[in-house]
Amino acid sequence: MTPSSVFNSPSCRATGARVLLSMLMTVLMCAPALAEPDAVVYKLQDESTIPSGPEGDAIRLGKMLLTDTRRKLPQHVGNGLNCSNCHLGAGTQPHASPWVGLIGAFPEYRARSGKLISLQERINDCLERSMNGKALAFDSVEMNAMMSYMRWLSADIAPGKPIPGRGFVKIDTRLKPDASRGEKIYAAKCAACHGAEGQGVPDGAGGYVFPPLWGKDAFNVGAGMARHFTAAAFVLKNMPVGQAGSLSAQEAVDVAGYFTQQPRPDFPASVKDWPN
């Protein structure tokens, strides 16, 4: 029997098919599960695509308000933070609560509110809680500018499509926090930027180079980042700066268990949260 006849025999072809199928299944099983099968992988918009005229002006203003919030919206910010302190990369970084795709995701049911809310309501949630400030009018120039920026970020994404990296990475909520271990991790890994007392590093202009994690200029008790596992999920994927991913899930849970329990501004309206 010639080599070619061996390779073309039914038994050889069947064996080859089984091997190929096995290899394919191995690849599929080992591939990282980024999101649902119909999720889209977004590409970041290039600023050269911002149009000229009023629409482009609104997009640029929106980005400025979201990245320099304390200085540009002093009447609506009650602490030293900017929106981009948590929404990293001007709202483009995966697993740092990016704004990419949000235009098509809202209205959305929020368990904390116990109802369907608009994106404008979600923005105001952040202003009142994370920024310890005041809500914007839905028809204000500033709100419309923020919406314009988020719409531009989402330009290539069909409404309703799952977005890989939306929100924060999932973390095992069965992990038990140890605040004493967390205090040691904070001192070793976090204090250089956020301060030994969580006070942050001032920028000399009333804001912060690195934001405070507790105290009067930090997010209030109603903010998502004041919730233990939300903070741990953010830390796990994004901190420390320049060493993201260097902490284990347990370390992230421990350090979040430490800093979320420190004193911060109150938010009386939080008694109405999670109504269902």
How would you name each of these model-derived features?
Residues 18-31:
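Bacterial N-terminal signal peptides
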Residues 117-184:
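Extended surface/linker regions that mediate inter-domain or inter-protein docking
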Residues 62, 80-90, 146, 182-198, ...:
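The canonical Cys-X-X-Cys-His
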Residues 40-75, 154-186, 201-202:
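Electrostatic cytochrome c docking/interface patches
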Residues 54-61, 65, 93-136, 146, ...:
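Extracytoplasmic electron-transfer domains, predominantly the class I c-type cytochrome c fold
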Residues 1-15:
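N-terminal secretory signal peptides that target proteins for export/translocation
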Residues 33-37:
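Boundary at the C-terminal end of the N-terminal hydrophobic targeting segment
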Residues 271-276:
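Conserved non-transmembrane functional hotspots
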